[in-house]
């Protein structure tokens, strides 16, 4: 069990309210236009908060994929009905054309180098049916660039003192986030997350290289500093004819 996985699990489930996941899924389903019963997947599902929302919103057996054994185990308990597979987004353990839609919430696909992101998008394109949707939800890089440095500190009951420090490189469009937890027992956990972001033109180019088409943002308007998230609809290229 890595410190990285433990920190992600303990901080996210305390600071991310269920309503946020419910809203994320509602918007994503509205963009994907996929009927209940069709095969859908949460890529980088974590401990299953979005899977649970998918189940609650009519998709009773969504597929969740994550490479963390800890998070997959948590997702099994958190999202009854979901099917869970431990796997890497760069090599999805799925047949070609097996998904009607896929969702990736909060940058799970963009935690590595740019080449990793391209490989992951190509894998997603491979597993989507022609015309199938991929909805990406990330933080808004325009908003991050307006405040490139931030620090958060809070004493969290049952967890300890949590410190989060973030530095955003606007030139590279990369955010470096270090989270540290000091537990009541005196244990200190720390991990750094390097998250790559894409402005819409760059995301469209990356999608095109992967065999996907960038369709639109939600809302369908240019990003500004006040836009909370980047939510993008990509689509698998339709077969000719």
Feature-to-residue mapping (PLM):
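Conserved class I S-adenosyl-L-methionine
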Residues: 1-35, 37-44
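Class I SAM-dependent methyltransferase SAM/SAH-binding core
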Residues: 50-91
